[in-house]
Curated annotation (Swiss-Prot):
This is ATP-dependent lipid A-core flippase. Pfam families: ABC_membrane (PF00664), ABC_tran (PF00005). Involved in lipopolysaccharide (LPS) biosynthesis. Translocates lipid A-core from the inner to the outer leaflet of the inner membrane. Transmembrane domains (TMD) form a pore in the inner membrane and the ATP-binding domain (NBD) is responsible for energy generation. Shows ATPase activity. SMART domains: AAA. ATP binds at residues 376-383. It comes from the Bacteria. Residues 28-310 form the ABC transmembrane type-1 domain. The gene is msbA. Belongs to the ABC transporter superfamily. Lipid exporter (TC 3.A.1.106) family. It comes from Vibrio cholerae serotype O1 (strain ATCC 39315 / El Tor Inaba N16961). Residues 342-578 form the ABC transporter domain. The chain crosses the membrane at residues 27-48, 63-85, 144-168, 170-188, 244-266, 283-302. NCBIfam families: MsbA_lipidA (TIGR02203), PRK11176.1 (NF008381). Keywords: ATP-binding, Cell inner membrane, Cell membrane, Lipid transport, Membrane, Nucleotide-binding, Translocase, Transmembrane, Transmembrane helix, Transport.
């Protein structure tokens, strides 16, 4: 999926401006300060004319006496304006980057699951960190240079034409050449900047995979594989950086050479008798110094072009992400609490990019308060059915109804409030156990309710032995807990939510036999007044289900109660024999 926008720099900057203008007070102050800074530099050069024409040649002139104080005052103004401009623009850029990161983060949270199926976590992290930091460069350092150097160029040009328009006319020829050179390198910088973003995404992704899979790397001796992988993407990033440096290193001397030709032309014209007769030493010195002074802002503008283009390329990528469609939430129906009756009617679903349907014409019902179990081989489509219940994906055809209303008619937040999910892939947050159990509902539950849920899930057995009990911080994804402990915290979270419909996707898969029996007792008690969809690998956990559905290659091939399915001696009976070694 391409995340780059096809917008021009101007269109991109207009979109970026919607963020910048929110902090226009700081922008106005910094712009005024930059103009004052540039004016101070220009005025100092202009002092050369009276110094040469009047100061040294006129013994009675007071100019030499006041000149040191003028220079001191100008330097003070220059320093103060420099501080004000840098501070204010840094304040503006910091806020702009913060707002863009917030919006991007919020956008990610509302993206459909299929988006994360296709994008690497490391690449997306790079967008939030590296790309947004490039925007800071465009909105602070680049803008500082553009405004300050732009004001300097305007001031110096004005000074030159004011003192000698004849000598200054040479710039009319030089200016288009400089503009063409800057435009050419800008396009090159922009292309390289996009490649750098992609390369940085690969670096982040490679590092993230190694860090998350560190135990696998150690277990299988994969250090050399990961080292080579990371070396490759790191070298790619280095190559792109060197391309940028090369382009910038070539651009700077080219601009300097063009400016040198302009100086050559000025010196040549000054030797012409008709022009020389009208020049005073002070006038010539001011014009020559101003033209020489143009080299610094021209070089700075060329250098900052690369930074500005990196910022614009990053903006295009970020805006491209923000333009991606979020989860469709067109439903209008809301229910305070549903009864929990679920009807799956002729559902067919195919994952994006796949040709074969994951589910084909699946139909079944779960009456209120009943339990239906899904069994079958891995990849048969069991978890897909659960994902369709909560609209992590939408069906291709058919419908899934909750209390007689199509799940697509519900508002997403309202729909998902009626489901509690315990997955085989437990995710916990770097927070306290209590906050993980009451996730996204802090303040809605009392401490006693949280503790009761933990006891029902048999989690208090290990929580009470932890340093701060329920207030113990468990690390990223619960790294300080065992697999079974993490599973019990997730079950406690589902118990506390008290949703009408429970989805247990291999909910006890990480538990030992003793813990599983204890948890199963708690789940049995919980399921009395709930509609439950159980996805099970261990057949012993679903023997009491009201109906068992055997799923194979996206189709339901058998259905019935445990004893009936065993009597049929079909696929379920075969699974049972394999699992129990019969």
């Amino acid at each position: 999926m391409s995340l780059h926008s096809d917008e021009s720099n101007w269109q991109t900057f207009k979109r970026l401006w919607t963020y910048i203008r929110l902090y226009k007070a700081g922008l106005v102050v910094s712009t005024i300060a930059l103009v004052i800074n540039a004016a101070a530099d220009t005025y100092m050069i202009s002092l050369l004319k009276p110094l040469l024409d009047e100061g040294f040649g006129n013994a009675e002139s007071n100019f030499l006496r006041i000149l040191p104080f003028m220079i001191l005052g100008l330097m003070f103004v220059r320093g103060l304006s420099g501080f004000a401009s840098s501070y204010c623009l840094s304040w503006v850029s910091g806020n702009v980057v913060m707002q863009m990161r917030r919006r991007l983060f919020n956008h990610f949270m509302h993206m459909p699951v299929r988006f994360f199926d296709q994008e690497s976590t490391g690449g997306l992290l790079s967008r939030i960190t590296y790309d947004s930091e490039q925007v800071a460069g465009a909105t602070s350092r680049a803008l500082v240079s553009i405004v300050r150097e732009g004001a300097s160029i305007i001031g110096l040009l004005t000074l030159m034409f004011w003192n000698s328009w004849q000598l200054s006319l040479v710039l009319i020829v030089v200016a288009p050449v400089v503009a063409f050179a800057i435009s050419f390198v800008s396009k090159r910088f922009r292309k390289i900047s996009r490649n750098m973003q992609t390369a940085m995404g690969h670096v982040t992704s490679s590092a993230e995979q190694m860090l998350k899979g560190h135990k696998v790397v150690l277990s299988y001796g994969g250090q050399e594989v990961e080292r080579k992988r990371f070396d490759k993407v790191s070298n790619s990033m280095r190559q792109q950086t060197m391309k940028l440096v090369s382009a910038q290193s070539i651009a700077d001397p080219v601009i300097q050479m063009i400016a040198s030709l302009a100086l050559f032309a000025v010196l040549f014209l000054a030797s012409v008798d008709s022009i020389r007769a009208e020049l005073t030493p002070g006038t010539f010195t001011v014009v020559f110094s101003a033209m020489f002074g143009l080299m610094r802002p021209l070089k700075a503008l060329t250098s900052v072009t690369s930074e500005f283009q990196r910022g614009m390329a990053a903006c295009q990528t970020l805006f491209g992400l923000m333009d991606l469609e979020t989860e469709r939430d067109n439903g209008k129906y809301e229910a305070e609490r549903v009864n929990g009756e679920v009807d799956v009617k002729d559902v067919t679903f195919t994952y994006q990019g796949k040709e074969k349907p994951a589910l084909s014409h699946v139909s079944f019902s779960i009456p209120q308060g009943k339990t239906v179990a899904l069994v079958g081989r891995s990849g048969s489509g069991k978890s897909t059915i659960a994902n369709l219940f909560t609209r992590f994906y939408d069906v291709d055809s058919g419908s899934i109804c909750l209390d007689g209303h199509d799940v697509r008619d519900y508002k997403l937040t309202n729909l998902r409030r009626h489901f509690a999910l315990v997955s085989q892939n437990v995710h916990l947050f770097n927070d306290t156990i209590a906050n993980n159990i009451a996730y996204a509902a802090e303040g809605e539950y009392t401490r006693e309710q949280i503790e009761q849920a933990a006891r029902q899930a048999h989690a208090m057995e290990f929580i009470e032995n932890m340093p701060q009990g329920l207030d113990t911080v468990i690390g990223e994804n619960g790294t300080s807990l065992s697999g079974g402990q993490r599973q019990r915290v997730a079950i406690a979270r589902a118990l506390l939510r008290d949703a009408p419909v429970l989805i247990l996707d291999e909910a006890t898969s990480a538990l030992d036999t003793e813990s599983e029996r204890a948890i199963q007792a708690a789940l049995d008690e919980l399921q009395k007044n709930k509609t439950v969809l159980v996805i099970a690998h261990r057949l012993s956990t679903i023997e009491q289900a009201d109906e068992i559905l055997v799923v194979d290659e996206g189709e339901i091939i058998e259905r019935g109660r445990h004893a009936d399915l065993l009597a049929q001696d079909g696929a379920y009976a075969q699974l049972h024999r394999i699992q129990f070694g019969e």
